[in-house]
Amino acid sequence: MRIERVDDTTVKLFITYSDIEARGFSREDLWTNRKRGEEFFWSMMDEINEEEDFVVEGPLWIQVHAFDKGVEVTISKSKNEDMMNMSDDDATDQFDEQVQELLAQTLEGEDQLEELFEQRTKEKEAQGSKRQKSSARKNTRTIIVKFNDLEDVINYAYHSNPITTEFEDLLYMVDGTYYYAVYFDSHVDQEVINDSYSQLLEFAYPTDRTEVYLNDYAKIIMSHNVTAQVRRYFPETTE
């Protein structure tokens, strides 16, 4: 446990979960067991008093922050004269109430950290899935173009004649712009690829965006025969 004397009325300490366990407490004791939580904090106060001569006189103000590796606690003596005149029993009761309130707040904060951790884990898994799909396309040739707006996407879907059995495709969107990626198998003749690219450029534009960029920053809004899906959900636009 590391103790820092801030001033005459305030001390700050940081204790790792390993230190907590070495003192006979578990991480769960702090957040779920009221009696054990109070016992732990009073034992810390005894150590602080021994090392820093920080005697508990009247009510204390406590701030607790939970981190991945441990807990940081800031403890301040009250400077309010009325509160300093409280009896020892009243001060102890108020200290216990503060401990429980702060433990509850810290537990809620830990729950939020757990939710954030789970969310980041899911995001990493999703990114990993995208990379696996990208890796599976090592033997493919890719065309990526940019559509200025949804109307251009619709026009391409209705007026082009792609050979959909020869490729896989994905429609991405990022920053309000649509990107269309087409993946041709290695056995597809280059002439077919050139013809498909020529049709695309009648409605879209070349782009320097890569598949890696789109997988990391864009959102996939359609996949697997994109043109058929567009025709299904959107009517043909009129000139």
UniProtKB/Swiss-Prot annotation:
Subunit structure of this chain's protein: Homodimer.
Transmembrane segments: none
Family per record: Belongs to the MecA family.
Protein's name according to its UniProt entry: Adapter protein MecA
Name of a matching Pfam family: MecA
Job description of the protein: Enables the recognition and targeting of unfolded and aggregated proteins to the ClpC protease or to other proteins involved in proteolysis.
Domain comment, as recorded: The N-terminal domain probably binds unfolded/aggregated proteins; the C-terminal domain interacts with ClpC.
Annotated PANTHER family: ADAPTER PROTEIN MECA (PTHR39161), ADAPTER PROTEIN MECA 1 (PTHR39161:SF1)
Region (Disordered): 118-137
HAMAP family in alphabetical order: MecA (MF_01124)
Top-level taxon in the UniProt lineage: Bacteria
InterPro entries: MecA_C_sf, Neg-reg_MecA
Organism taxonomic ancestry: Bacteria, Bacillati, Bacillota, Bacilli, Bacillales
One annotated GO molecular function: protein-macromolecule adaptor activity
Gene name of the encoded protein: mecA
UniProt biased composition (Basic and acidic residues): 118-128
Source organism (scientific name): Staphylococcus aureus (strain COL)
